[in-house]
């Protein structure tokens, strides 16, 4: 898939082994920035587990000018996250990744922390609805279970 961000083209592909270092760097930095209400230690301690799990997951990687600028993972229609490199945010990359999942799945779900206001606003703009507010068992933070349906009623 290719798309135009307004100033340069980007393309998506399935995660490759050689993508892992850049993807993990984006995962860590994006989580630290978006979730400053969760201790940094939590994200750093989870990095090895993420490193192990990513190659087995369904992951879409986004590149611009040969550089990885974002990625998203999904499990049976549940979006595990959309992560975009900080300098590339607000250029349509997250939307393009989300649109690819919308193209592939008739129903999407995800969880987003209540305090992550920018992500919450993004998903609401993209047609997701809040299903319920729940507490994350690990972090103790409140988050919304959200759903999008492309099924025509």
What name fits each language-model region?
Residues 1-18, 152-153:
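Conserved N-terminal entry element of GNAT/NAT acetyltransferase domains
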Residues 49-61, 78:
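A short helix-loop-beta-strand connector motif used in the catalytic cores of GNAT acetyltransferases and
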Residues 58-70:
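Conserved beta-hairpin
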Residues 78-89, 112-113:
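A short, internal acetyl-CoA/4′-phosphopantetheine-binding micro-motif in the GNAT/acyltransferase core
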Residues 84, 90-103, 121-125:
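Conserved acetyl-CoA-binding loop-helix of GNAT-fold acetyltransferases
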Residues 95-96, 115-143:
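Conserved active-site alpha-helix within GNAT-family acetyltransferase domains
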Residues 103-115:
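Conserved GNAT acetyl-CoA-binding A-motif
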């Amino acid at each position: 898939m290719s798309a135009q961000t307004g100033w340069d083209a980007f393309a998506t592909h399935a995660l490759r082994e050689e993508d892992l270092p850049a993807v993990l760097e984006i995962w860590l930095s994006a989580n630290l920035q978006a979730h400053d209400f969760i201790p940094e230690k939590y994200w750093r301690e989870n990095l090895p587990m993420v490193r192990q799990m990513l190659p087995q997951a369904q992951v879409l990687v986004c590149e611009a000018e040969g550089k990885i600028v974002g990625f998203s993972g999904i499990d049976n229609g549940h979006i595990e996250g959309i992560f975009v490199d900080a300098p590339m945010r607000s250029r349509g990359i997250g939307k393009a990744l989300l649109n690819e999942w919308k193209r592939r799945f008739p129903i999407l779900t995800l969880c987003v922390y209540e305090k992550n206001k920018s992500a919450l606003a993004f998903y609401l703009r993209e047609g997701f609805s809040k299903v319920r507010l729940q507490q994350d068992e690990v972090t103790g933070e409140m988050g919304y279970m959200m759903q999008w349906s492309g099924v025509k009623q």
